[in-house]
């Protein structure tokens, strides 16, 4: 899935809501992984995803800024930033190559992996009960954004506490309108 970003009108920017009908209840231990490829455009900043808890209480943001070879993972509670984890690496965060992203959520923290590099966010999602997964642009009442980075995504997978895949979006099939037609 290739995101339409800053080169198009805000209303035409890519939005992918993995939980359009209802939020997911995953417990305190689960994982999310996917592949991301960065494209070079004039503006390279934007929200890859927002994982929102209980509709408004907390949010985990993944922000890409390819111009600076930088990924930010920011945990917000209410209107405050709880923690910010940066990956800045011009050898790993490069355009036109697939980069593996994996987040492992536990009660102790969130292990974030970008290819082989790993960092730990010492705050957990233990107070996150129902989760919404929003990629790119979204119209959420509290976490609305149209800042979409020029990226492509594939192979989004959610794992349960036993490491078993419970959801998989390959993002390989599209119609002429750009809508994803994958199996879920």
Give short role names for the model-derived ranges.
Residues 35-42, 104-106:
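Solvent-exposed strand-to-loop "edge" motifs in beta-rich extracellular domains
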Residues 96-111, 161:
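Localized edge beta-strand/strand-to-loop motifs within extracellular or lumenal beta-rich domains
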Residues 20-32, 89-97, 104, 146-152:
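Extracellular/lumenal carbohydrate-interaction signature centered on repeated Trp-anchored short motifs
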Residues 121-152:
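Flexible glycan-contacting loops in extracellular carbohydrate-active proteins
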Residues 1-24, 162-184:
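Extracytoplasmic low-complexity segments
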Residues 36-40, 144-175:
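Extracellular, beta-strand-rich glycan-interacting domains
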Residues 49-77:
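Glycan-recognition/cleft segments
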Residues 75-100:
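Short, aromatic/His-centered strand-loop micro-motif at the edge of beta-sheets
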């Amino acid at each position: 899935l290739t995101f339409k970003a800053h080169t198009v009108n805000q209303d035409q920017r890519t939005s992918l809501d993995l939980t359009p009908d209802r939020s997911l209840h995953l417990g305190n231990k689960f994982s999310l992984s996917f592949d991301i490829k960065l494209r070079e455009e004039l503006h390279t900043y934007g929200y890859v995803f927002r994982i929102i808890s209980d509709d408004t209480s907390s949010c985990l943001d993944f922000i890409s800024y390819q111009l600076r070879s930088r990924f930010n993972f920011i945990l917000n509670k209410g209107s405050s930033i709880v923690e910010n984890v940066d990956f800045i690496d011009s050898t790993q965060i490069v355009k036109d190559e697939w980069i593996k992203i994996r987040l492992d959520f536990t009660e102790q923290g969130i292990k974030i992996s970008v290819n082989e590099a790993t960092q730990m966010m010492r705050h957990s999602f233990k107070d996150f009960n129902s989760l919404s997964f929003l990629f790119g642009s979204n119209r959420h009442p509290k976490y609305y954004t149209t800042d979409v980075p020029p990226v492509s995504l594939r192979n989004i997978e959610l794992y349960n506490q036993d490491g078993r895949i419970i959801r998989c979006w390959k993002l390989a099939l599209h119609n002429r309108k750009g809508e994803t037609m994958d199996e879920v």
